[in-house]
Amino acid sequence: MAKKIVGFVKLQVPAGKANPSPPIGPALGQRGLNIMEFCKAFNAQTQGIEPGLPLPVVITAFADKSFTFVIKSPPSSILIKKAVGVTKGSATPQSVKVGKITRAQLEEIAKTKMKDLTAADMDAAVRTIAGSARSMGVNVEGV
């Protein structure tokens, strides 16, 4: 028989920098999960990824206090800001533009995000990422 799932915990954790301090400690502690075990496993799995890059992680908690977790790809907004070279998007994206992004950069981001997107093909994924970039006040070239 499969283990009984008691809940899910969704967090954004910097790659390679999971530690028991908030928000990880309290979120896992209230479910009775071993916080240090998660931190060590997460840091081991994210070794090859740029340190500090925020990664969404979904932790499945089971009734016997065990857990599994799935690491997703980084948020599109963070990848777009990194490609453009800005720290934050425009407060008024319709009038004030913060930078520009090329189709090649969009394709690179789409390759990274493809497993988490619902897009049918690469072109649809590029258009999805381009829409996110436009809503952040970034000029999109070649789409």
UniProtKB/Swiss-Prot annotation:
Family per similarity comment: Belongs to the universal ribosomal protein uL11 family.
Classification via PROSITE patterns: RIBOSOMAL_L11
Species in which this protein is naturally found: Albidiferax ferrireducens (strain ATCC BAA-621 / DSM 15236 / T118)
Alphabetized InterPro entries for the sequence: Ribosomal_uL11, Ribosomal_uL11_bac-typ, Ribosomal_uL11_C, Ribosomal_uL11_C_sf, Ribosomal_uL11_CS, Ribosomal_uL11_N, Ribosomal_uL11_N_sf
Assembly description: Part of the ribosomal stalk of the 50S ribosomal subunit. Interacts with L10 and the large rRNA to form the base of the stalk. L10 forms an elongated spine to which L12 dimers bind in a sequential fashion forming a multimeric L10(L12)X complex.
The protein, known as: Large ribosomal subunit protein uL11
Entry's Gene Ontology cellular component terms: cytosolic large ribosomal subunit
GO BP annotations listed: translation
Summary of the function given for this chain in its UniProt record: Forms part of the ribosomal stalk which helps the ribosome interact with GTP-bound translation factors.
Gene3D superfamilies (UniProt xref): Ribosomal protein L11, C-terminal domain, Ribosomal protein L11/L12, N-terminal domain
Keyword annotations: Methylation, Ribonucleoprotein, Ribosomal protein, RNA-binding, rRNA-binding
HAMAP family noted in UniProt: Ribosomal_uL11 (MF_00736)
GO molecular function: large ribosomal subunit rRNA binding; structural constituent of ribosome
Modifications after synthesis and translation: One or more lysine residues are methylated.
Domain of life where this protein originates: Bacteria
Gene, per the UniProt record: rplK
